[in-house]
């Protein structure tokens, strides 16, 4: 089993090369029209399987379609990867939508709502005391 340093190096290389493939080689208008970014790569310890989490500026429905398009084109992407990097075996890849950003934004929205409620209650309390 490779050490963590090797996993990090290979993950970094995969992220860099797949980003270049998405930007330059992939002929997909949906992906080109929306800013698609690789947020995280989970690489298995044996370097055989790779989950690629993407974020995009698109709405959730469009992001789902982008992920479907990427998974449809994954054999082409994997083939391009094989030409670009020297590995005994290019890992099997699967694309997933990274929902962490959405969850973080919803938490921030809830915190803002709570803050506004507290401010409104404080104003009402001050008015009642006056």
Curated annotation (Swiss-Prot):
Gene3D superfamilies: 3.30.300.20. One of its GO terms (cellular component) is cytosol. Belongs to the RbfA family. InterPro entries: KH_dom-like_a/b (IPR015946), RbfA (IPR000238), RbfA_dom_sf (IPR023799), Ribosome-bd_factorA_CS (IPR020053). HAMAP family: RbfA (MF_00003). Keywords: Cytoplasm, Ribosome biogenesis. It is found in: Cytoplasm. One of several proteins that assist in the late maturation steps of the functional core of the 30S ribosomal subunit. Associates with free 30S ribosomal subunits (but not with 30S subunits that are part of 70S ribosomes or polysomes). Required for efficient processing of 16S rRNA. May interact with the 5'-terminal helix region of 16S rRNA. It comes from Prochlorococcus marinus (strain AS9601). This is Ribosome-binding factor A. It comes from the Bacteria. One of its GO terms (biological process) is maturation of SSU-rRNA. One of its GO terms (molecular function) is ribosomal small subunit binding. Monomer. Binds 30S ribosomal subunits, but not 50S ribosomal subunits or 70S ribosomes.
């Amino acid at each position: 089993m490779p050490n963590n340093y090797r996993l990090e190096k290979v993950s970094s290389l995969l992220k860099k090369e797949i980003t270049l493939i998405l930007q330059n080689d992939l002929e997909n208008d949906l992906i080109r029209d929306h800013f698609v970014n690789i947020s995280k790569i989970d690489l298995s310890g044996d370097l055989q399987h790779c989950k690629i989490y993407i974020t995009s500026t698109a709405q959730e429905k469009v992001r789902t379609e982008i992920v479907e398009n990427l998974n449809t084109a994954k054999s082409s992407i994997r083939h391009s990867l094989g030409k670009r990097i020297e590995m005994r075996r290019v890992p099997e890849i699967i694309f997933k939508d990274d929902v962490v950003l959405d969850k973080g934004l919803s938490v921030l929205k809830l915190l803002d709502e709570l803050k506004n409620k507290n401010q409104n209650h404080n104003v009402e309390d001050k008015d009642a005391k006056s």
